[in-house]
Design a protein with these regions (language model features):
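Boundary at the C-terminal end of the N-terminal hydrophobic targeting segment
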Residues: 22-28
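Acidic/histidine-rich catalytic neighborhood of metal-dependent amide-processing enzymes
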Residues: 127-226, 250, 257-258
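Bacterial N-terminal signal peptides
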Residues: 8-19
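Stable alpha-helical elements in mature extracytoplasmic
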Residues: 32-40, 55, 59-66, 136-142, ...
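A non-catalytic alpha/beta surface segment that caps or lines the substrate-entry region
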Residues: 38-102
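Active-site-adjacent substrate-binding region
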Residues: 55, 76-78, 82, 208-315
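Structural recognition of the beta-strand scaffold that forms the well-ordered cores
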Residues: 96, 107-110, 159-162, 200-206, ...
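Acidic/histidine-rich, surface-exposed loop or edge segments in extracytoplasmic proteins
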Residues: 36-49, 212-216, 282-283
Length: 315
């Protein structure tokens, strides 16, 4: 989960294409919180998933297979960082899933899929086992369920990006947001050459499974003039759907993956996050702290919002 840190990364680029089949034929009726909860539990059954670990590799394979089966075009964006404890290289890999890749103008939906190496805020076991059910699996679970609907989305194309190394940290001063920073730099470089997709906006899903869900507007997302309309449009959809857990007032100012996306990539990105979570960075961040109802409310809002996005103007 997010915190304020300086960003440093030693990178070696490797891009791995993992192609997907044709899109699924029939679109389901509505977002299922129960299915999303099943996905969350399946991800957590992999165990702790810190960057560079065998469990992270297994999770990545599981997710690639899931999104391929749903009709997404799946690819990996790989690079390396140096382990600040040993100096040895660590494999980092963002997972990218594209829907309707022929559409140049696109919307970015993102989440991080790594878990913190240790539950360092746990008062009893700060070097214990950290599952990251809410902080690591909840945003992923929402995207896994949203995948069922992407073939039928009109308007701009949609990319899912699962960021690695959001919190590959062991001590104060270690850098955060390495995956999103790398992604933003690669995107910015492509835009300078007028290559690749053009992102209209982005939405970051982080810690959205809390059974006591309260999603306030994140202060940075509201304060940035280019991002405020994204925030307002999502909360308007939530109000129409009667999802009261989306509270239309700002509360926390949070450093998260949306910061490099906006500052480096120039992608106006809104952070959807419930930061009032007592189990944050503790051994208690388990599926029992999450609920299908919460995942369902977030997923239905994002799906309805996506369906309302206008088509790109013809050129």
């Amino acid at each position: 989960m997010p915190n304020a840190r300086s960003l440093f990364v030693f990178v070696v680029l490797t891009t791995i294409a993992i192609t997907g089949p044709a899109a699924a034929a029939a679109e389901p009726a509505d977002f299922s919180g129960e299915r999303a909860m099943e996905h969350l539990e399946a991800v957590c059954q992999v165990g702790p998933r810190p960057s560079g670990s065998e469990a992270m590799r297994r999770q990545r394979a599981l997710l690639a297979e899931h999104f391929r089966a749903a009709g997404g075009a799946v690819s990996g964006q790989a690079f390396r960082i140096r382990d600040r404890r040993t100096g040895s290289p660590v494999h980092i890999e963002n997972l990218l899933i594209s829907w309707h890749p022929d559409r140049r103008e696109r919307i970015l939906l993102a989440a991080h899929y790594d878990t913190r190496p240790y539950p360092d805020r746990d008062p009893f076991d700060p070097r214990g086992r950290f599952i990251g059910a809410n902080d690591g699996a909840s945003g992923v679970a929402v995207l896994m369920e949203l995948a069922r609907f992407m073939a039928g989305i009109e308007g701009p194309g949609v990319d899912f990006v699962l960021f690695d190394a959001e919190e590959y940290v062991f001590a104060a001063g270690d850098p955060y947001f390495l995956g999103s920073t790398y992604f933003a730099r690669q995107y910015a470089a492509a835009r300078r050459k007028e290559e690749g997709p053009v992102y209209r906006c982005g939405v970051l899903l982080d810690m959205v499974g809390d059974r006591d869900l309260e999603i306030w507007q994140e202060r940075r997302s509201v304060s940035w003039p280019e991002t405020r309309p994204v925030v307002e449009s999502i909360w308007e959809v939530a109000a129409r759907l009667g999802v009261r857990e989306f509270i239309p007032r700002p509360r926390h100012e949070i450093d998260d993956d949306h910061v490099p996306l906006r500052n480096i990539g120039k992608i106006p990105t809104c952070d959807i996050i419930d930061f009032d979570y007592p189990a944050w960075h503790t051994t208690r961040d388990t599926p029992e702290q999450c609920s299908a109802e919460s995942l369902g409310k977030v997923g239905r809002v994002i799906l309805a919002w996506l369906r309302e996005q206008p088509e790109a103007p013809s050129r």
